[in-house]
Regions:
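Glycine-rich phosphate/dinucleotide-binding loop and adjoining beta-alpha-beta core of small-molecule
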Residues: 2-4, 43-159
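Positively charged, low-complexity intrinsically disordered leader regions
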Residues: 1-45
Length: 160
């Protein structure tokens, strides 16, 4: 397996958009299908899934995966952290599509304080929080959430 740096991943994404050509939303859909496939081959549809998403493209990926897993019969609870009320274009498109299809077990858009759901060893957490673009230490509520997730017994799939 080749492990790429954040800069290499962004460069490959841009190369694909420039040379295939493919719209960034379609590239996100393609990546989300691959993530969904990886999850469905490893986890039964009876496990509870909790998705944490931020307003950027990692969150857009996570929301698309939420939709796709729900279409396959998985029980998904999705949480989108939209504290500042601004989403990336692709995140907004995936949020709107997720809400309009109405297949997820629950969808919550967090705009202020947040009490995380209980995570057990049966839970699969899909981490659509921050990826390779994060260039500073986490602080505040996100630092607490990541600590909570990491200290849980849940299984975790991180998206980037």
């Amino acid at each position: 397996m080749k492990i790429l740096t954040g800069a290499q991943i962004r460069e490959l994404d841009q190369y694909t958009i420039d040379h295939e050509p493919i719209a960034s939303i379609d590239l996100m859909e393609r990546a989300s299908r691959a993530i969904t496939q990886a999850i469905t081959t490893r986890f039964e549809s009876t496990i509870p899934i909790v998705v944490f998403a931020v307003p950027g493209n990692n969150g857009g990926d996570a929301l698309a995966v939420s939709r796709m897993l729900s279409e396959k019969g998985y029980i998904v609870d999705a949480y989108l952290f939209n504290i500042h009320g601004t989403l990336s274009d692709n995140c907004e498109k995936n949020r709107d599509r997720l809400k309009s299809e109405g297949l997820v077990h629950s969808y919550t858009e967090i705009t202020s304080n947040f009490d995380p759901p209980k995570l057990t060893q049966q839970t699969l957490v899909i981490d659509g929080l921050f990826g390779s673009g994060l260039n500073k230490p986490l602080t505040g509520g996100f630092a607490s959430l990541v600590k909570y997730i990491n200290q849980s017994t849940a299984r975790i799939v991180s998206i980037d």
